[in-house]
Amino acid sequence: MSHLAELVASAKAAISQASDVAALDNVRVEYLGKKGHLTLQMTTLRELPPEERPAAGAVINEAKEQVQQALNARKAELESAALNARLAAETIDVSLPGRRIENGGLHPVTRTIDRIESFFGELGFTVATGPEIEDDYHNFDALNIPGHHPARADHDTFWFDTTRLLRTQTSGVQIRTMKAQQPPIRIIAPGRVYRNDYDQTHTPMFHQMEGLIVDTNISFTNLKGTLHDFLRNFFEEDLQIRFRPSYFPFTEPSAEVDVMGKNGKWLEVLGCGMVHPNVLRNVGIDPEVYSGFAFGMGMERLTMLRYGVTDLRSFFENDLRFLKQFK
């Protein structure tokens, strides 16, 4: 009992020196635990006369209460300090700009397709589609390219078997459309096509768009006027345009269309011609009554010319540094 005041003072000193909650708990066990210094003081009561024990017990309990209060106060201080330190470490500078949600953008080839569809849509063309896995009839035979025709050698075709292939052109869509409906016909046919070629200006898969008109009294003049308007609208310039005689099995006469580039050189942009009478006969349309014109162009080619891209493969490499330029 004589050491009670010293024990309380010693406990309070240890409590004030505890640097964290774990150290503080060690002090609690040392003084108030089952075998703690103040707890053991209760065992000295048996040495006192019975009439003195209640008063002595009250003094010991008062000492334990003082130490418990000191423990509680110090624990609150340590927990508050720990919370403040954590908040300081996790602080947010509200003056910093927020993380902006970046909007996506259309792929440049998609932008080109949309632009062309919009232009021809205003001229009354509808969009037609067809299968990418095609048969040799729709891809070759019906287009005046029979099995013995030398033009078949010009296509590096991906064949599945002797009759099925990945289409090399979207012209098969024209055949399917003409077989399904009678003139007047006015369609454009965008889609993916496949050829076994890969270099700076060719990829095994690329996008093509073909156009077709079949009606009475359609002439080459109609074809030239349509393509003149289209190219000047697409490039947004009053371009110098020329038509060169060419050869395609499915058109007669045929032409390739060039535009004058900024470097003063002619650049080929598309092929076109009047629908060959044999093609019309193959789909049950009388070439003595109806005529038509067709044209075809590569979407990547036009996109390269419009945006000044030098390597076609850039469109398929998914490099965001490249693609973000077109947003």
Swiss-Prot record:
GO BP annotation list: phenylalanyl-tRNA aminoacylation
What reaction gets catalysed by this protein? tRNA(Phe) + L-phenylalanine + ATP = L-phenylalanyl-tRNA(Phe) + AMP + diphosphate + H(+)
Coiled-coil region list: none
Any one cellular-component term (Gene Ontology): phenylalanine-tRNA ligase complex
Residues annotated as transmembrane: none
Q: What is its main location?
A: cytoplasm
On the tree of life, the source organism's domain of life is Bacteria
Where does the UniProt annotation locate this protein? Cytoplasm
- GO MF annotation: an example: ATP binding
Instruction: Please describe, based on the UniProt annotation, the reported consequence of changing residue 191 to D.
Output: Decreased affinity for Phe
Against SUPFAM superfamilies, the record matches this protein to: Class II aaRS and biotin synthetases, tRNA-binding arm
**InterPro entries named in the record:** aa-tRNA-synth_II, aa-tRNA-synth_II/BPL/LPL, Phe-tRNA-synth_IIc_asu, Phe-tRNA_ligase_II_N, Phe_tRNA_ligase_alpha1_bac, Phenylalanyl-tRNA_Synthase, tRNA-bd_arm
What does the annotation give as the result of altering residue 98 to D?
In thermosensitive mutant pheS5; might cause subunit disaggregation due to electrostatic repulsion
Which UniProt keyword terms apply here? Aminoacyl-tRNA synthetase, ATP-binding, Cytoplasm, Ligase, Magnesium, Metal-binding, Nucleotide-binding, Protein biosynthesis
* Residues that, per the record, bind Mg(2+): 252
Q: Which Gene3D superfamilies match?
A: Bira Bifunctional Protein, Domain 2
Q: Which cofactor does it need?
A: Mg(2+)
Report the EC number(s), separated by commas if there are several. Answer: 6.1.1.20
Broad enzyme group:
ligase
The answer to keyword Magnesium applying to this record is: yes
Q: Does the keyword Metal-binding apply?
A: yes
Cofactor mode of binding and number, as noted: Binds 2 magnesium ions per tetramer.
* Subunit relationships: Tetramer of two alpha and two beta subunits.
Please report which protein family the annotation says this sequence is part of. Belongs to the class-II aminoacyl-tRNA synthetase family. Phe-tRNA synthetase alpha subunit type 1 subfamily.
Q: What is this protein called?
A: Phenylalanine--tRNA ligase alpha subunit
